[in-house]
């Protein structure tokens, strides 16, 4: 048992970048058409999600002009056109969401099925020494814990990160289009949120990786003890068995507690930072309007309420996307850890087949084993 555990603990770990690259490359090989279609639909959905701020500014500008001129008849048509166009974009976003979610569901489950088949086929060709140095429970965890972690990463985390990245890039472009000064204010607050995510999320991620490995060790230990339970009872080895299990079980408790401690602390902190950033943006916008601060923007529009209100909406969007990223980091880390173990198993060298073995009758003459032409009850090959 100790030998197997020690062997598992010293296996080399692949770099995270190579693991993700290899995972995506294999997904592309499995689904060369459906995967890019699903990813493209995710990008379209993200762009549609970023557009409401643009239409909000347009509608507020139209209403503001109506208040000044009193000509509602001309403003009514423009408002209806913008609302209808926004509704069209929402419908496109809904259709893109359907294509994205359904496509990624097919890709995820199909890819996992192919990985399980590849692992099982590869396992049949592994040498006996591999099974002598790896616990049965540890091998089983490839098909359960590790595959499930990959499912979470491929089916939810990676599409969510792509969606969030596109939304953030789109919102940043829109912010600088309307006001560079306000964009810098929001980016400063976002950088503080990113710093908190890096510090707390990094500590949480390390413990989630340890949790993934320790869970496999616990399963391997339990599987080994269950298979040898009769031997344990015959030799009255129950106290030592309980002691060894308590040790590894306590280790799993510690790493799981630390992982969830940091993860559960991060989200409330980010939510409150997002609320503070929202208030700061509202105050700064009011000051800019009151002092008639000259706006610096690509659009050339003055800084008015029509510009300020969409920035409040974009502040919410920005903080929400950062929260979503922080929530997916742990799933990605656990998925990478699971993929690393799966790829290590697939990369194990197979047993060399040097032909068939023929059994013959043998006898020992002068200390040398020789082939006998009659039945001796002893065999050699």
Q: Where on the chain are the PLM-derived regions?
A:
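Membrane-integrated ABC transporters
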Residues: 1-49, 64-85, 100-104, 108, ...
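Hydrophobic alpha-helical transmembrane segments of ABC transporter permease domains
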Residues: 96, 100, 108, 144-189, ...
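Solvent-exposed, non-transmembrane helices and loops of integral membrane proteins
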Residues: 135, 220-222, 350-364
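Transmembrane helices of ABC transporter permease
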Residues: 30, 34-44, 159-210, 283-303
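Internal alpha-helical transmembrane segments of multi-pass membrane proteins, especially GPCRs
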Residues: 36-40, 52, 80, 84, ...
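Juxtamembrane helix-loop junctions of ABC transporter transmembrane domains
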Residues: 9-16, 48-64, 68, 89-136, ...
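An intracellular "coupling" helix at the cytosolic face of ABC transporter transmembrane type-1 domains
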Residues: 25-32, 128-129, 147-154, 158, ...
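Helix-loop-helix
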Residues: 65-67, 174-188, 262-340, 346, ...
């Amino acid at each position: 048992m100790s030998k197997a555990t020690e062997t598992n603990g010293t296996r080399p770990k692949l770099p995270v970048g190579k693991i993700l690259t290899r995972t995506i490359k294999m997904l592309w090989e499995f689904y060369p058409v459906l995967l890019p279609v699903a990813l493209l639909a995710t990008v379209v959905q993200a762009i549609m999600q970023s557009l409401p701020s643009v239409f909000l500014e347009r509608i507020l500008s139209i209403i503001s002009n109506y208040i000044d001129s009193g000509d509602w008849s001309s403003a009514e048509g423009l408002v209806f056109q913008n609302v209808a166009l926004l509704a069209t974009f929402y419908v496109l976003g809904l259709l893109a969401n359907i294509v994205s979610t359904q496509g990624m569901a097919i890709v995820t489950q199909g890819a996992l099925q192919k990985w399980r088949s590849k692992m099982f086929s590869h396992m049949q060709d592994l040498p006996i020494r591999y099974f002598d140095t790896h616990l049965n429970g540890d091998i089983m965890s490839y098909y359960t814990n590790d595959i499930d972690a990959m499912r979470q990463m491929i089916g939810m985390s990676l599409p969510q990160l792509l969606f969030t990245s596109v939304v953030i890039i789109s919102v940043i472009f829109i912010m600088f289009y309307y006001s560079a000064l306000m964009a810098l204010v929001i980016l400063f607050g976002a950088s503080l949120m990113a710093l908190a995510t890096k510090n707390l999320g990094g500590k949480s991620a390390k413990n989630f990786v340890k949790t993934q490995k320790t869970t496999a060790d616990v399963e391997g230990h339990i599987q080994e003890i269950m298979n040898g339970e009769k031997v344990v009872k015959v030799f009255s080895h129950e106290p030592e068995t309980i002691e060894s299990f308590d040790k590894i079980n306590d280790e799993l408790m510690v790493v799981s507690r630390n992982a969830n401690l940091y993860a559960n602390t991060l989200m409330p902190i980010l939510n409150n930072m997002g609320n503070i950033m929202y208030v700061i943006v509202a105050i700064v916008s009011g000051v800019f309007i009151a002092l008639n601060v000259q706006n610096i923007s690509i659009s050339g529009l003055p800084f008015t309420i029509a510009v300020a209100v969409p920035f409040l909406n974009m502040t919410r969007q920005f903080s929400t996307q950062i929260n979503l990223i922080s929530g997916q980091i742990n799933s990605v880390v656990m998925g990478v850890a699971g993929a690393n173990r799966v790829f290590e198993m697939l990369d194990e060298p197979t047993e060399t087949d040097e032909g068939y073995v023929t059994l013959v009758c043998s006898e020992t003459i002068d200390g040398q084993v020789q082939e006998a032409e009659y039945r001796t009850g002893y065999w050699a090959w």
